[in-house]
Amino acid sequence: MADGSELYTVESILEHRKKKGKSEFYIKWLGYDHTHNSWEPKENIVDPTLIEAFFTREAARKAEIKAKKDKMAAGKKGASSKASASVSKASASTPARGAKAAPKPPPKKSPPKRQRLAGGDIRPDSDTDEEHSSADKKSKAEDEEEVEDDEEPVPKKKKEVQEEPEEEESVEGEDEEESQEVEDLKEDEKMEEDEKEEEEDVQLESEKNEKEEEEEKVEEKKEEEEEEEEEEIQLVIVEKTVIETTIVEPAVATPEPSEPSSSEKAVVENGSSSAAAGNSASKPEVSAVEVVTVEDDDDIAIIE
């Protein structure tokens, strides 16, 4: 971050993380390249609108990703439903394996044999016999034609049996595509769950941060209240001390002067006269002194 001599400007917030219960943001600084990007605590971001703009962008980005995934999942679901419909249609058109061919009609009864006469000769055919034999031949020919008609679809069935492996291969390919789509859907669901968990973690972290901020505010308010209470207590103590240490001097009554008695007046007068006499006696009169110097050092005369 900036030191005391230089102030850095935040250009944009790139990422957000939680470290030791505190929010940190990856900052791109204005006028600096990506090599100067740094993780900074929330307190270092002066403008709170930058944080709000970052979380708004993150929410829009996640919503866009989720919408794209939902769209992809819906497309894959439609493709899988179409593939399953085509598979069911192909299976319906393909005959079941081991299907039995149409049963052949029961063979017609052969005409009765000619009867022999008593002499061992065969009875000649009558007109009715000839008609019956011709009718039998005709019916036999019709039966053979019917049998041929019944046998005509057999080669077609063989061809269908030969085409079954190709259809099986196509079905297997469709099954693989369906399994791949299912795996893709599972991966998408897993990614959505991871993103959802990440969003829940971010939300929990934001709630935790808000709770911590509220607790810090409560603690600060509590400390302020305690400081105010301490100041009030100190003020009360100071006032009490001032009251106790203040000295109140009582007023001293001055007695009124009374007139002295006659004896006291006499004593006072005598005292004043004696005091005056004493003062005069104690103060000797000073006269001029003349000092005469004599040649002899030992004799010094003082003349008044």
Swiss-Prot record:
This is Chromo domain-containing protein cec-1. It is found in: Nucleus; Chromosome. One of its GO terms (biological process) is heterochromatin formation. InterPro entries: Chromo-like_dom_sf (IPR016197), Chromo/chromo_shadow_dom (IPR000953), Chromo_domain (IPR023780), Chromodomain_CS (IPR023779), Heterochromatin_chromo-domain (IPR051219). It comes from Caenorhabditis elegans. The keyword Nucleus applies. Residues 106-116 have a biased composition (Basic residues). GO terms for cellular component: nucleus; pericentric heterochromatin. It holds the Pfam family Chromo. Residues 75-102, 248-292 have a biased composition (Low complexity). Residues 63-73, 122-141 have a biased composition (Basic and acidic residues). SMART domains: CHROMO (SM00298). Residues 8-66 form the Chromo domain. The gene is cec-1. Gene3D superfamilies: 2.40.50.40.
